[in-house]
């Protein structure tokens, strides 16, 4: 009976907190990325700006004899 209690205590007091603390491990990486200026909102603004500049008419309506009309 005491060994079962010891196993339960080991699981809930040692192993369970170790497993749950690893889930928060990515927070420091996110903080460093923000300090380097890799903000996601800035990346989204840049990607929208690039997409507006590109001529997507060619991709939306390919020429009749192009490869993409066969697909």
Swiss-Prot record:
One Gene Ontology term of the molecular function aspect: toxin activity
Q: How is it modified after translation?
A: The D-Phe is essential to the structural conformation.
Q: Which residues carry this modification: D-phenylalanine?
A: 67
Q: Highest taxon of the source?
A: Eukaryota
PTM 4-hydroxyproline: at which residues?
Answer: 64
This protein's major location comes to secreted
Q: In which tissues is it expressed?
A: Expressed by the venom duct.
Which intervals carry biased composition (Basic and acidic residues)?
28-39
GO cellular component annotations, sorted alphabetically? extracellular region
Report the locations given in the UniProt record: Secreted
Region (Disordered), start-end ranges:
27-48
Report further notes. Answer: Negative results: the unmodified synthetic peptide shows no or weak activity on muscular and neuronal nicotinic acetylcholine receptors (alpha-3-beta-2/CHRNA3-CHRNB2, alpha-3-beta-4/CHRNA3-CHRNB4, alpha-4-beta-2/CHRNA4-CHRNB2, and alpha-1-beta-1-delta-epsilon/CHRNA1-CHRNB1-CHRND-CHRNE).
The Swiss-Prot or TrEMBL record describes its family as follows: Belongs to the conotoxin M superfamily.
Free-text function comment from the UniProt entry: May act as a neurotoxin.
Q: What is this protein called?
A: Conomarphin-Mr3
Upper classification of the source organism reads: Eukaryota, Metazoa, Spiralia, Lophotrochozoa, Mollusca
